[in-house]
Amino acid sequence: MYSLFFNNRRIIIYSNNEPKQRDKMTVQHLLEDPSTVHFFPGNDQKTEELPFLFTKLTNIEKLMILTSDQEATLDQLCKKLIKITAGGGLVTNNEGELLLILRDNLWDLPKGKQEDGEDIETTALREVEEECGIKDLQIKNKICETYHTYMNRDNNLTIKCTYWFHMEYHGKKTKTTPQKEENIEQIVWIKPTELPQYLNNTYESIKELFAEATTQLSIFQPQTAKN
């Protein structure tokens, strides 16, 4: 399943045979939502124009696309869009806490654009280091990708694909420095149990990232009481 976010609205690409249980449940929930609109691709040209049409149809919150080839449909949807690749990190420390940043009055995670000749893991590490002023980072694994759209400075519809990695930080948590040039106002370390209150003030794409991360990272799993 792929979600393309248009602010808090989204286009969802799915198939009838989602491999992940979470995706199956998400699709079922969306299909039962009366505000969901369905689109069945049959014409490549119409599919290419769909993102531009969706930006105008602001009364539609969710547009579901059923397809047998999700990647091909994603490529078709993005064919006429400006494409940007970015890398970012969900950072945890030795105390099992998560790093969040406050940017433009919304809680977010550090991320940024891939530079020429740079592999995506290097991008993700560099951006976390620059935006948070921390080093001693180690990538543990890739979590997922998220897709969101925006209008660039030339008023062209742009899609940013962000590759998210779980990173472990082995330094002192007091050593963070928000990058003011990127409008980062605050950096906090929080316990996983505190996360829901922060997700009340964040982007839908970040909520999706954490939904995936909770199925992968041990810090989100219930701790067994020790005798």
Regions found by a protein language model. Name each.
Residues 1, 86, 160-164:
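Short hydrophobic/aromatic beta-strand or adjacent loop that forms the aromatic wall/cage
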Residues 1-55:
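N-terminal leader/capping segments at the start of a protein or of a new domain
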Residues 2-6, 16-18, 22, 27-31, ...:
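Nudix hydrolase/Nudix homology domain
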Residues 27-31, 40, 92-129, 134:
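Conserved Nudix-box catalytic region and its N-terminal flanking loop in Nudix hydrolases
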Residues 43-88:
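Acidic, metal-coordinating catalytic segment for phosphate/diphosphate chemistry
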Residues 88, 97, 186:
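Conserved beta-strand and immediately adjacent loop positions that scaffold enzyme active sites
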Residues 91-94, 167-169:
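Active-site beta-strand termini and strand-to-loop segments that position acidic
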Residues 114-203:
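Unchanged
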